[in-house]
Amino acid sequence: MSSLPHNHHYETHHRGTAEVPFDELIGVTPDGVPVISNGNEAHFSNLESITAACLPLSSFERKAPCKQPYRKMGVKWQCVEFVRRYLASRKAVWMTSLCTAEEVWREENLFVDVRDGRPVEVVRTPNKSTGPAPAVADIVVWGEGPETPFGHVAIVTEVCASCVRVAEQNQGFEKWPEDVPFSREIAMRTTESGEVELLDEDPLLGWVTVQAPFYNFDDGDLADSFRLVVGQGQILRQPFPKHVDVPWLNTGEECDTILKHSLVVDGNMGEGAHAEEGDVPGAFYFLDYDMFCRLGRAASSLHRIAMAATAKVLEDPESTHLLEHYFGVPPEIQPLLRRSWEMTPPMGGRFDFGYDGKNVVMLEYNCDSSGALLECCNTQEKMARFYGVSQGTSTGSFLGAKCVTYFQRLLTNEKVCPQHRLIHFMIDEDDEERYTARCMMGFAEQAGFRTKLCVKLVNFRYRDGPPSNAAPLATPCDHPTIVDGEDEEVLMVWKTWSWDTVLHQYHSQRSSSDAVNTPTLSDILLNNNIRVLEPLWKAVTGSKAILPFMHALAPDHEHMLAASFLPTREIISRHYISKPVNGRAGQNIMMYDPVTSPTELEGAPQQDICEALSQNASARSLLNGSPLPLSQSVDQTNECSPGKFFDSVLVYQQRLFLKKFDGKYFPIFCGWMVGDEFGGVVVREDTSKITKLSSMVVPARVVRDNVPLGVSYSDEGET
């Protein structure tokens, strides 16, 4: 660090005597926007500040840079860059390019709404005028002067009785103290005639009010895209008293009624209904802004890689072999899978992220599942209201809005959307499937679809002739038309059955000699007239067999563990696990100690699928290799899980040691994807190191403000 000169300008603008180096954090505003050091006022880096969500997380993404609009924030770390980033982060408003900071005062048509590009109006209040006083998020503008040769801009962060506090870049370079979340104070006075004046030795022109509300995170997360991640992030688990009568659930709502029925003892919904204590959450997780953004960007990035890996599998010269032997898709079904890849967009899924106290790492991608949807988008907010937890917002606040948007887009997709706009929601006889389906049906209906709930396979039958309500651009096929009990054509289905289950039933049906006159599960979901959500190609993307392909494309990704079909030297030289590619709910995961035998390490495969793919070679010969038998030592200090979903190939993966909270709990942070967009976070925790179907969903909050995590609470019932 170097000393600052002691002249009038520095003495009035700076608190300390030492500069924070260029590109390092000075402080964070009360509402969560970082201020970064430019080093000194004379420095012009000529380096571009890129919208945070566009920054690549691996070499794979650096090969195909983000091309979305509103990507360039300005020159690092000038005052204009900060104002542009602040407005984008807090209001989803974009400030167009400027030659100098002073132009903010005089140029017209400077601001647009990031969501739709519409102009945003402003009010300019000259200094020492009778206009409105400065308010939080206003832009203070200086003109050209000896110390501000290009003008200057800052953001009002707080208004006090006799001053305003502002945040700014390229004016003041000392680290902010913990209790001083602003750059400086500017004296303010009001004259007897009602004129408001900000007192500063530099030529202060006035303040600009951007007439747009703060961004509503119930509607989406667009504003999060612009937030810089400046630290590893923090997570707090705060215990709360358990209420076994689950009073936050509103039995006047169908979804809540079904959810309560699934929780209470013996399904008793009468007086005294209660759940077992072990079935009710007893805590909230609080995530700071850095952590939430890390999770969201990891999910978005890894989804792109998963899609690219799926394409890689389908394009491989030996794709027929790969699909059959590693993903369980028989050759006769593969044309239907490829058609679904071409026709039907992804709907949703969840990344399971592990956290070791520092790293956030993907464990797997459950993208053929909608479990914990209601709990994420609805229940955890109701719990927050019951407990009086107002800090932050639900980590699923915008999940419902994203689902509605997905269905709205689907409604305009002429390749997919049937003309009668009807979706059949097919589920098994299970409370969780029922309330999840009802929740999703509500989103589809908001978008304009009609819906029907179909429990098991009751009342489906075949009908002669082609469907009359097929999507306008659907390709005719020779598959039979299927109708429901009211003779309405089944042309779009949302399902809870996994594709593993569907394909298993398909194989069983083929090997059976029993005649079947009504449509079976596979007859419906493998019918080329019917578009399915999730589509059949999710049998690839949703399989754990995709993990080695993902790692092959982005081996340096900061949120991914090494994975392979072979016990490679890279994997077995550390703690590692094995798991079946189609295992679910944590079944048959085995944990192993590192292999220490020099002979075994020397004989372990060094090449894996990564090298084959990078050379555009067929992966078949590599995957068919027989690894040397290992003297695998099961990690006796940790847990393994018995059982299998179906017999399948194994994937080997490096192990992450999960952080234990409150000396007992191991959470998994599940990052939702809806379509191709991040949808929020839901947390599942267990006292076991392996998350299972029975693992508790625990409410979570994201705290975007710059405040300590957690709330004060006294157990006095609902507040």
From Swiss-Prot:
Keywords assigned: ATP-binding, Ligase, Magnesium, Metal-binding, Nucleotide-binding
Keyword Ligase: yes
Reactions the enzyme catalyzes: spermidine + glutathione + ATP = glutathionylspermidine + ADP + phosphate + H(+)
Single GO MF descriptor: ATP binding
Ribonucleoprotein as UniProt keyword: no
Site, as annotated: Transition state stabilizer: R350
UniProt-annotated binding residues for spermidine: E432
Maturation and modification: The N-terminus is blocked.
E.C. number(s) listed in UniProt: 6.3.1.8
Descriptive protein name: Glutathionylspermidine synthase
Organism annotation: Crithidia fasciculata
Lineage: Eukaryota, Discoba, Euglenozoa, Kinetoplastea, Metakinetoplastina
Gene that specifies this protein: GSP
